[in-house]
Amino acid sequence: MKKLLTFIMACVISLGATAQISEKAFEKWHQNKYSMFIHFGLYSELGGVWEGNPVTRGYSEQIQSFAGIFSDWYGDTALRFNPTLFDADAIVSLAKEAGMRSIIITTKHHDGFCMFRTATTDYNSYDATPGKRDFIKEM
């Protein structure tokens, strides 16, 4: 019964949650319509393959869950994550040339890896990788 009441309270409380951006800002973004969405993160290093075998369940960014990879093994992927061909200027130019008005990029996925430098964790693209890059700042 306690679990049910806790669940109901959580639902009720979440109804009062407010957006992190203003309604005006959201409306402006929504009117842009044509945007680039970039799904990029530590999982990109694996390319949907774990230990030489393709992981066909789920999406590539879900590889840790669907391949049953332990957190420390998955975390070791950061030691070789060095996307030297990532070119923020080229990406922005491509989006502009295509008439896109905004770019949305994954800053932190459910694996917990941050694509930006942060003081809250070392598990990020600057502190945990050989490339020492803040991809969000570059964008």
Which residue ranges define each predicted feature?
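Generic cytosolic/nucleocytoplasmic N-terminal low-complexity/intrinsically disordered segments
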Residues: 1-2, 32
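Mature catalytic domains of secreted/periplasmic carbohydrate-active enzymes
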Residues: 19-139
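Hydrophobic h-region of N-terminal signal peptides that target proteins for export
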Residues: 9-18
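Sec-dependent signal peptide recognition
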Residues: 2-10
